[in-house]
Amino acid sequence: MPYTPHTPEEIRQMLDVIGVKSIDDLFAEIPPEMQPRSFDIPEGMSEMEVCARIQRMAAKNRIDLVSYLGAGFYDHHIPKAVDNLVSRGEFYTAYTPYQPEASQGTLQAIFEYQTAVCRLMEMEVANASVYDGGSAIFEAMMMAARATRRSKLVIDEALSPIYRTMLASYTSNLNMELVTVAHNEGRSDKQALMDAVDDKCAAVVVQNPNFFGAVDDFTELFTHARSCNALGVISVYPVMQSVLKTPGEMGADIAVADGQSLGMPLSFGGPYLGIMTCTKKLARQIPGRIAGRTKDVDGKTGYVLTLQAREQHIRRAKATSNICSNQALCALRAIIHMCLTGPEGLVRTAELSMERAHYAADRLTALPGVSLLHDAPFCNEFALRLPVSAYDVVDRLVNHGVVPGFPLGGYYAGMDDVLLVACTEKHSFEQIGIMAELVGGML
């Protein structure tokens, strides 16, 4: 049966109310020569026919490829229990838990998520999430601008180009000055970043590991920023925070991340999760929901949304953002994933991913003309210079069922021969060996 939202009788009643005889009368102001004579719309199909057509379209997707794509989004193992638990009816909603008396389960889950990401980052305050890693970076910049009353922002070019494009778009009409400091062959130029930070700067924004996979320590940079009354903002890879120096240890004021690696499948680009944490001093500047723990009149532990005067449903004109229910369901996936994996499991995931990546780097750099882009330490992702176009290598290997990495020529000038390769615990040594042999056969 077709789904018809309005019956002929209902349409007739609506036309009578507005005083016209037919639907065509609604378009009478359009000159006849501009009105379409007909619409090139195919005949309707039955439900079975629609399903068959969609299946034929879906069959064009390649799901059998062994992929070494990363660039901020990684194919980590997700315990099967995550899907089962997050799909429970008590949780499966986008509703914001304004009513604590009816939302204790959801509020406690958000509180536990905030606690977990604060421990992971070694920061003091977390919100209930924002949309993704890029929006988290933007919100961090806005926090810095509000807190310092300054408009200059220093951006490391080794920050994800996806994020940098978003920042340029979001700030294009906000009278903010974005100063981009060039990278040095894939490494962050910390001295140049320090030179760019002055008493007019609101924040310096970096990433660790950076887009090229290089791991760094920004403690000195953040100390310098603090001496200029500017803030230190860092974007991180959540899984690798289990083995790397944390934002809190470096002295960052705001730490953000894309939480995709904590239980979110790649899913053609989303939905993902924006993680935001900060120091207690900036708690009233952070956007979005914050769940807090308290005691009720009977002395029982309860959970509520707190510091709500920051939010648009309380002070619309002066709100820190227009974030509403945001990615609460994705945040729930993240906390379930972290609880099922545990601290030791997260460390093991990072170690296995690093082990695979370093094996892949050794195999690939043994090929003639192939070298690492930089000599910085790396975790599970690294950039290679090839003796041929990286795009050509990818195009040819896809025909063999392998995506060997992410070509960087479209994002960085002079890098048509650079390939970004990422490994996770899901890649076997055998798969990596086959990929290396295929690359070698095309050089």
UniProtKB/Swiss-Prot annotation:
This protein's species is: Oleidesulfovibrio alaskensis (strain ATCC BAA-1058 / DSM 17464 / G20) (Desulfovibrio alaskensis)
Lineage of source species: Bacteria, Pseudomonadati, Thermodesulfobacteriota, Desulfovibrionia, Desulfovibrionales
Q: What reaction gets catalysed by this protein? A: N(6)-[(R)-lipoyl]-L-lysyl-[glycine-cleavage complex H protein] + glycine + H(+) = N(6)-[(R)-S(8)-aminomethyldihydrolipoyl]-L-lysyl-[glycine-cleavage complex H protein] + CO2
Alphabetically sorted, this entry's keywords are: Oxidoreductase
Keyword Oxidoreductase attached: yes
Per UniProt, the enzyme's principal EC class comes to oxidoreductase
Alphabetized Gene3D superfamilies for the sequence: Aspartate Aminotransferase, domain 1, Type I PLP-dependent aspartate aminotransferase-like (Major domain)
Role this protein plays: The glycine cleavage system catalyzes the degradation of glycine. The P protein binds the alpha-amino group of glycine through its pyridoxal phosphate cofactor; CO(2) is released and the remaining methylamine moiety is then transferred to the lipoamide cofactor of the H protein.
How it assembles, according to the record, is:
The glycine cleavage system is composed of four proteins: P, T, L and H. In this organism, the P 'protein' is a heterodimer of two subunits.
What family name appears in the similarity comment? Belongs to the GcvP family. N-terminal subunit subfamily.
Q: Name one GO molecular function term.
A: glycine dehydrogenase (decarboxylating) activity
Q: Which HAMAP family match?
A: GcvPA
Can you say what this protein is called? Answer: Probable glycine dehydrogenase (decarboxylating) subunit 1
| Record carries keyword Oxidoreductase | yes
